[in-house]
Swiss-Prot record:
GO terms for biological process: methylation; protein modification process; protein repair. One of its GO terms (cellular component) is cytoplasm. CDD domains: AdoMet_MTases (cd02440). It is found in: Cytoplasm. Belongs to the methyltransferase superfamily. L-isoaspartyl/D-aspartyl protein methyltransferase family. The lineage of its organism: Bacteria, Pseudomonadati, Pseudomonadota, Betaproteobacteria, Burkholderiales. It catalyses: [protein]-L-isoaspartate + S-adenosyl-L-methionine = [protein]-L-isoaspartate alpha-methyl ester + S-adenosyl-L-homocysteine. This is Protein-L-isoaspartate O-methyltransferase. NCBIfam families: pimt, PRK00312.1. It comes from Janthinobacterium sp. (strain Marseille). The active site is at 138. GO terms for molecular function: protein-L-isoaspartate (D-aspartate) O-methyltransferase activity.
């Protein structure tokens, strides 16, 4: 009998093993016609999606590996069964995410363990949900979409070092840890930084480094980065982050105020970057400084 996969997996069980075709994953370089990622507005999304019935479905093919024993937390409730998680992954794939490594990572990370128990029943709907401090955990589709775009690089998807701006509860960092060799994540709100540490500690994720600080400044002591991903929207991407990208590196960020778009920025040379717009989105605002 094949053992079922659960998080945490060893990095080698996903990274560098999924088959890839010769072609790079196609990235839409113009705004999609009328497609808007579900807003990162927790109250609105909870009311819209909170009663949705999730029907288990088979996701796109993903690598399967031997698994660690399930935690007592996971065994305790049918709401967090593997079938429900697979239904989420299948829905993300149906929305257009094709990268098998990204889908495998989404399938492996237990999203319900990164939010309050009262919201566990909503953990696998395609919506952002509150995590405290007026912040949210991003909807599954947008997490997968941004990571897929970041991986579609000139190195065939290899990500040696990634920077995340806005750790939040730690969920996206956990997903990133399965597709990148090293993950650095910055959170400006002290309470969320501590929450992410508490969430990730029992999962024994060895390749994540969490930092408390101003994400708009980046992390120059660990630069350069093959990929940078922002979980909050500014009017523009801070120059400090652009300068911390490797040549050929990719940065994915929401940009805008009332109307926001997901933007891809690629570093072409030491003094040249090119950008393209992917689709509409809605995130919490990017702010400077720190909150104790």
């Amino acid at each position: 009998m094949t053992e079922k996969k659960r998080f945490p997996l060893s990095l080698s069980s996903i990274a560098e093993k999924a088959p890839r075709s010769g072609a790079r994953t196609e990235v839409n370089r113009s705004s999609t016609s009328g497609k808007v990622a579900t807003p990162q507005t927790a109250t609105q999304n909870a009311s819209q999606h909170g009663k949705r019935t999730i029907t288990p479905a088979r996701p796109a093919e993903v690598p399967r590996k031997a698994a660690a024993a399930p935690s007592s937390n996971e065994r305790a409730t049918p709401l967090v069964s593997e079938a429900v998680r697979k239904a989420m992954t299948a829905r993300v794939a149906k929305q257009g995410v094709k990268d098998s490594k990204v889908l495998a990572a989404m399938d492996a990370v237990p999203r319900h363990l990164f939010m309050e128990p009262a919201l566990a029943s909503q953990a696998y709907i395609d919506a952002s949900l509150p995590i405290g401090y007026h912040q949210t955990i991003s909807q599954p589709y947008i997490v997968a979409r941004m990571i897929e775009v970041m991986r579609n690089n000139q190195q065939g998807g290899v990500l040696n070092r990634v920077l995340e701006i806005g750790t939040g509860c730690g969920y996206q960092a956990a997903v990133l840890s399965l597709v990148a060799k090293e993950v650095y994540s910055i959170e400006r709100i002290k309470g969320l930084h501590e929450l992410a540490k508490a969430n990730l500690r029992p999962m024994r994720v060895a390749n994540i480094r969490l930092h408390y600080g101003d994400g708009m400044l980046g992390l120059p002591q660990a630069a350069p980065f093959d990929g940078i991903i922002l979980a909050a929207a500014g009017l523009e991407v801070p120059q400090a982050l652009l300068e911390q990208m490797t040549i050929g590196g990719r940065l994915v960020a929401p940009v805008g105020e009332r109307h926001q778009v997901l933007q891809l920025i690629e570093r072409v040379s030491k003094f040249e970057w090119k950008s393209s717009t992917l689709e509409d989105c809605h995130f919490v605002p990017l702010r400077p400084g720190t909150v104790t």
